[in-house]
Structure formats: structure tokens, C-alpha cells
Amino acid sequence: AEFNVPILADLPGARELSLNAATRHSDYDTFGTTLNSKFGFKWKPIDSLLICGTWAEGFRAPTIADLYSGGSQSFDFFTDPCDSVYGAARTNPAVRARCAAALPAGVNAANFRQQQQGFTPTTAASSQTPLAFVSGSNDQLTPETSTSKTLGFVWSPGFIQNFNMSLDWWEIRVENTIISDTANLILNDCYINDIAARCSAFTRDPVTGIVNNLKRTGINAGYREVEGFDLDVSYRLPTDRFGNFSAQWTSTYTSRDDLVTTKNAVTHPNPRTGVGWAGYAFRVRSNLNLGWEMGDFGASWTVRYFSGMKEACLSAVTFPEECNLPNYASPNNQG
């Protein structure tokens, strides 16, 4: 059900004021019922300015594939935190102590080496396991729930025809985030984040100490929370003799992007803003497009900008100087 309620119109300070409310009831055989609502407002104090905001709940059930697609084997690339050359144990005493407790009695944690294909010591920060790991679905997944908030404005000044500018603030928090687990996440949670429950997802060879069995599935992470701003500026200039010119600049600034990969309450969020991770969370993304049209002809020029990023390199403890990228711009010409 959805309701749009006009409150005021054509008054000084309120050319338009309206409220919006919507709610949806869903019934799932696997998860029961859920009720999710959304509320919003629009306020136009003057003809050239529109202010709007929303608050909404969200719900996403796991797909059939997430729950029941079965399993398969794969030879994953990963970094063992206990590796004495590339792992976090090299420089982190707490990780080194946890590794010493987990490795077989005959293996010296100070000299332990992860093994790659061919059962030889790894020669890179991320190496392929010589033993197959198991990946697949998870019939214990539960639905994601979310809360989102937005607030913004659109400005279309009368003294500049065909000019529009909008700025929006947004914040989204997703609980029980469904993510694809990885060998790195599991091992890092066990040894670096000291989450004991995650250590049960794998075993080590009783003689060599290498990871000989690991199962990864989709999991419900603790939460993901993102916050940022969207800016959109556009202008069109029509002419009688030279065609129509246009310009549009869109930018997104991510002020916060936190991820907790476990429901463990004491785990601190992993701040992803400006740090390369799955999906690469650039702090700033920007696009500028210039266009021209005349009759059957047209041309456009686009440039994309991504702000500088520090990569969450798997070997950051060993090679920190290799974990940075400069600002990046990519032009695109079309005609």
C-alpha cells in the first residue's frame, strides 16, 4: 500500500509540501512474514528549490541458489596469516602466538611456510592451495534487513535556463549481510581478528601444519554501513546555428564504508573507505561528460576520475610500499 498526502501548495514558503508513506507485507515459506515501510517528504519553499528526504526499511531473502545449490571443489588463492614470510605472523606477535598454538607440536611457528601447488614453499603473497577446498551454498542463511536514509535538494534557478544541480546525502545499514566467504576472510578472522568460531571452518595437516581442508559458503556477516553524498550538475545550451551543447558532472563521495564479517559483537568494523577491498571502495568517484548534437551528428567526451586508494594488500606487512595507487583518470572520446 502507498499513500501520497499533499499538505500545502502555492503558498509563500510552501509552493509544495507533501508526505509519502508506503508499506509492503511479504510472506516466505522459508522465512515467514515481514513488513517493510518507507516514509518521505517533498518541500518546495520556492519554485526553483526542491528539498526531499526518505527513511526506508529493506528486506532481502537468500535466493534458492544461495540456499540449495550444493557444493563444489576449488583450488583457492589465499595467504596463510601463519606464513613466516608473507603472513601477518611475520610482524604481529599476537598472530604469531595464535599460530604457534594452532600448528602441530613438531612445527616451529617462526619458520612455518605456506605451501603452493607442488607442495613447495610459497613464492608470492597469495598462492594457490595444493589441496582442494570446498565451496557451496548454505541452507542456514537468514534474510538481510536494512535501514536507509536520504536527504537532499534540487536547484533549478530561473536566471540560468536548462541548469540543474542536486546534492543528496545518504546512509544505508544492512544487517545480516549475505556475502561470499573466502579463505582469506576465514583465516584472517581466526588469527588476526581472534574470532574463535571462525577457526572451525578449516583444519591443518597434523604433520606439516598447512591448511588441508577448508569449507567456505555464503554467510551472514555482521553488518555493512555506508554513508556518502551524490552531486549532479547539468547544463544544456541550445543554439540555432551550431547545434546543442551539454555538460554533466556527477560525483559520489563515500564518507564511510564499514564492514563486519561476523556477528561477533566485539569485532570492530573494517573501514573500507579509501581502501581497496572486494569492489574497491574509492572515496571519490567522478564523471564529466561534454556533448554536442546537430542534426544527425553528435560527439561526446567523457572523463572518469577515481581518487587515490590504499590497497588492502595481502602482503602489506611485508611490502607496504607496493600497496598504493595514485589518483586515476580515464578519458573517453566518442563521435
Regions found by a protein language model. Name each.
Residues 65-165, 214-229, 280-283:
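Outer-membrane beta-barrel signature, preferentially recognizing the C-terminal barrel domain
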Residues 162-314:
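Gram-negative outer-membrane beta-barrel transporters
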Residues 22-27, 136-139, 215-220, 268-277, ...:
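Extracellular loop and loop/strand-boundary signature of outer-membrane beta-barrel proteins
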Residues 1-44, 146-152:
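Surface-exposed extracellular loop regions of Gram-negative outer-membrane beta-barrel proteins
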Residues 2-6, 22, 40-44, 142, ...:
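Transmembrane beta-barrel domains of outer membrane proteins
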Residues 1-3, 35-41, 49, 137, ...:
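Hydrophobic, lipid-facing positions within transmembrane beta-strands of outer-membrane proteins
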Residues 7, 23-29, 55-61, 68-70, ...:
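Transmembrane beta-strands of outer-membrane beta-barrel pores
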Residues 8-17, 48, 89-98, 106-108, ...:
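Short loop/turn motifs that connect adjacent beta-strands in outer-membrane beta-barrel proteins
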